[in-house]
Structures are given as C-alpha cells and as structure tokens.
Amino acid sequence: LGDAYIDTQTLEINMTGGAASRITARVRKDEATGWIFAEATIQAIDGELKIGSQIQYSPKQGGATVSGDYIYLATPQVENGPCVSSFIISGTTAATRASDIVTVPIKNNLYNLPFTVLCEVHKNWYKTPNAAPRVFDTGGHQTGAAIILGFGSSADYDGFPYCDIGGANRRVNENASLEKMVMGMRVKSDQSTCSASNGRISSETKTTWSCIQNTAIIRIGGQTTAGLRHLFGHVRNFRIWHKALTDAQVGESI
C-alpha cells in the first residue's frame, strides 16, 4: 500500500508507495521531553479487504544503519471506535488488555466517615459505553458497604456524574455533557452525602454507610479486568481526605 517516512531530525514527512496519495500524516515534537508524536491515516478504497499497519525503523535515504542506532517507541491508547483497547509495555512480546484498572488496598486509605474523594476525570465518549462507567468503586467489602463514583444515564441525561453509597445516590445531571471535570463525593460525620462535579454540588441525603472492612479494595477505572463498567477515559489526582471538605473546597473545576 504505502508508507509515511518521518525524518526525526527535521520532522519532514515523505509519502511513498502505490497508496501515497491516500495517506495523510502529521507530526510534532515535545521540546520538553524530546518525544515525537506521529499520526498517519490511509483512506481505504473499494476492494481492499484488509489493511494492516506497522512501525519500522529506517535509515535516512541513501544512508545505512550503523552500530549504536536506536529508537524508542511507545504505542498509543486506542479508545474510540470498535477497536477500543489499551496497549501496555510488555517487553519483547506484544500484549494488550481490555481494561486498565488500578487496584489499591483500602487498608490505611479509607475506613469510616467522614471522608471526601476528589479527582480529575476525562471521559472519551459522549454516550455511555456501558451500564455505569466507573471512576472508582470498591470490591471485597461487607454487605451494604459498597462505594461507587461514576457516570450514569437516564432518559433525560446521558453521562451524568454520580455517587452511590449506602442507599445515598446523588447525581449532578447538569454536567452530563462535560468531557473533563473535577468530580467526587463527600460523606459527613452525620452521614449526609453529596456528589460534586466541576463546581456543582448535589443536594444531600443520608447514607446508611458507616465503615468498610480493611480487606476491601479500591478499583479505579473499571470494575473487572474483563472490561465490565470500564471508564474509557482517564483519572488523575485521585485524592481521599479523612474529613468533610467545605463546599468551596469541593467546588473545584477545570
């Protein structure tokens, strides 16, 4: 088909092959880190049943590879379309997994109320990809002690941020359409619970939750490694306070 050759020094792109006219490519360099970000797209035509892709190292035109030449490669996360997956560093053997989940022991991180959780979330979708994409939840807890922070959907709002803990289900419907936000939940000493998203705070209701056993775990980004309730997005600056933050503190936004 065709190739897009990128000069890593000048960032010049040269298209070759029979499909060169159908290839578009772009490249930029992050001067702070030295990484070069490259992207190439080919326009398919009728009759092409399969199109593969690969990354190759090539010496400069007219030159040759010499001892000591090397290049670092990092594959991107593919998080849109029917081929959603996340590639991971795996040594010399290629590997992929359906769901990137961070699992954290709850021991010494969270036990009882009051507490507040805040994090930055970027969801890479506009329509919920499953029943309830998780920002985080818990596993291995005792009956009635589950904690959930994620996104839900209804007839009127698709993708609203919400929390669910001990029968207290709090939503911020107004921010259902946001792709990036600071979101979280707060549980006070008197069990009053609310959800927060980018400066909006839901009304409060009482939870029956009081504590969680120390053998439980916190799961960030999904529910199972099989992809159940996978977020299909990014979570960063995940923070837990062992106190109820004020409305002003909970009202962070990005």
Which residues are covered by each model-predicted region?
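Aromatic-rich beta-strand patches that line glycan-recognition/binding surfaces
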Residues: S53-P59, P129-G144, D164-G166, S197, ...
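A carbohydrate-recognition surface predominantly in extracellular/luminal proteins
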Residues: N109-W125, A146-I148, E179-M185, V235-F238
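Extended recognition patches within non-cytosolic domains
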Residues: V78-Y111, T128-P129, R236-I254
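Extracellular beta-strand elements of beta-rich domains used
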Residues: A40, A74-V78, C119, V235-I240
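Short surface loop/edge beta-strand patches of beta-sandwich-type extracellular domains
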Residues: A98-F115, G140, N169-N175
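Extracellular glycan-interaction patches encoded by glycine-rich segments
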Residues: Q54-G68, Q213-I240
